[in-house]
Amino acid sequence: MTELFRHSKHLLASLALLSVLGLMLAMHPSPSAIERIMARGELVVLTRPSNTTYYEDQHGFTGMEYELAKGFADSQGVELRILESDDLSYIRYAIRKGTADIVAAGLIATPERSKSLRFSTAYQNVDVLLVRRLTSHRITDLSQLNQQTIAVSAGSSHAELLLKAQLESPELEFQEVENATPEQLLALVEDGQVDYTLINSNSYTLQRALWPDLVADYTVARDMPLSWAFNPKDDKSLYQEAQRYLTQAKADGTTAKLEDRFYGHVEQFNLYAARSFMRHLDDRLPLYEDLFKQAEEDSGFDWRLLAALAYQESLWDPQAISPTGVKGLMMLTNNTARQMGISDRTDPSQSIRAGAGYLRRTHARIPDRIPEPSRTWMALAAYNVGYGHLEDARVLTQRQGGNPDNWQDVKQRLPLLAKPAYADQLRYGTAPGGQAVAYVRHIRRYYDLLVWAENSRRRDDTLIALN
């Protein structure tokens, strides 16, 4: 009886202790997901390096996903830390294990993925395109792909689309390639290892000129939502904050401005121009690459930006000459050559050095309060149309209620300089401002292509073996 009484006392004491602990936990609950982020002072975002998400250019890290994630981190008053992976399986594992707070990797929110991940509202919608060689058979329906070789990245939304298509066309077969990037899959098609692959329309838009022998003329799926992914086991505090941010970003034009920044300079595809660029990338650029890299050290500009400028000016032809007398790789005037202290405009070394130096001098005149990349795009416009005319465009931008320190606003006013009704009210008069806008757009396009041609090392490193 005494022993039973002793056990009862222990049981009552344990129950009392548990009650106290329960009360303490109720009074001091575990911090929420957003509170944990605020406490550590950083937001951890997992992404895939690509031209549509996250990459490095002359101004540092950038990309549509990166800029959105950076904006969200800033809105919460915390630092942004980026983790990278090309492995879709690891990405899903990492978010569920808490390795990252958010996945911002250009993921399409599919019904299958939504079973294991919590997705935000879409920040962008894309089409899924079927890519083939120009010499391959054009299809009008997926059922026509029977007996054709198709490769997609393993575990991707593209694989899900093809699995769904198999329900209606059981003979449709495809291969899933582990951790394959879009560039690797495009290389497989170009080299004839497979007949087709799938690609998101935003990715194809940015790199189409790198693959002039490929075409995407069949749409597999339309308006697929690109979304951020969250751990469904977490409370919804972080998710709700992200939802508010993305909704506001759409409402206040932030998302639209980012789309214009990353896609607005991509002009209509020109097959001849693309093939010429790829040919010159192989047979001309290597002759001058070291000179551009030396100019980078001297000027501080990314050598690929200088190379893009030179391609716009001369197609990397040191003997190029215009009807107005400008000549050389950087197409310098006699006056500019004298200013920069060179004697032979057709000498590649002198021309590149002088062109880079002149761009640096022009860039230094742009007010340093103007953030990048707007400051560089304005410097390029001034390089083309003259600094005074650029300043006129900025004055006009301010008069019309725009931001004179933002390239997106200024480029809308530059074409107005050609109209006397506007130019007569400005200091420097009329100018071909629309030409300057096109000039900057072309250079940005060539620069993007050079960055991605190098980053993906498509010539040697993107060819992968199929299982």
UniProtKB/Swiss-Prot annotation:
SMART domains: PBPb. Gene3D superfamilies: 1.10.530.10, Periplasmic binding protein-like II (3.40.190.10). InterPro entries: Lysozyme-like_dom_sf (IPR023346), MltF (IPR023703), Solute-binding_3/MltF_N (IPR001638), Transglyc_AS (IPR000189), Transglycosylase_SLT_dom_1 (IPR008258). One of its GO terms (molecular function) is peptidoglycan lytic transglycosylase activity. GO terms for cellular component: cell outer membrane. Residues 268-467 are annotated as: LT domain. Residues 1-33 form the signal peptide. PROSITE patterns: TRANSGLYCOSYLASE. It catalyses: Exolytic cleavage of the (1->4)-beta-glycosidic linkage between N-acetylmuramic acid (MurNAc) and N-acetylglucosamine (GlcNAc) residues in peptidoglycan, from either the reducing or the non-reducing ends of the peptidoglycan chains, with concomitant formation of a 1,6-anhydrobond in the MurNAc residue. It is a peripheral membrane protein. The keyword Cell wall biogenesis/degradation applies. It is an enzyme of class 4 (lyase). It holds the Pfam family SBP_bac_3. One of its GO terms (biological process) is cell wall organization. Residues 34-266 are annotated as: Non-LT domain. In the N-terminal section; belongs to the bacterial solute-binding protein 3 family. In the C-terminal section; belongs to the transglycosylase Slt family. NCBIfam families: PRK10859.1. This is Membrane-bound lytic murein transglycosylase F. It comes from Alcanivorax borkumensis (strain ATCC 700651 / DSM 11573 / NCIMB 13689 / SK2).
